[in-house]
């Protein structure tokens, strides 16, 4: 699905760092290190990144659009 703008639990804006997270993740950096550097410290916000499906640079939304 499309990455959410805000954390579902606390309401912090998390979408502003998603592009940086996605870029650095494709460069084979550790998700823990990336989130620490980006200042995402709350567990609920970190969960939003960890649970978002991202394989080979493609999101779930990209797969769904193919069958439209």
UniProtKB/Swiss-Prot annotation:
One of its GO terms (biological process) is DNA-templated transcription. Its main location: cytoplasm. It comes from the Archaea. One of its GO terms (cellular component) is cytoplasm. One of its GO terms (molecular function) is DNA binding. The keyword DNA repair does not apply. Its EC number is 2.7.7.6. It catalyses: RNA(n) + a ribonucleoside 5'-triphosphate = RNA(n+1) + diphosphate. Keywords: Cytoplasm, DNA-directed RNA polymerase, Metal-binding, Nucleotidyltransferase, Transcription, Transferase, Zinc. It is found in: Cytoplasm. Binds 1 zinc ion. NCBIfam families: PRK04016.1. This is DNA-directed RNA polymerase subunit Rpo10. It comes from Methanococcus vannielii (strain ATCC 35089 / DSM 1224 / JCM 13029 / OCM 148 / SB). The gene is rpo10.
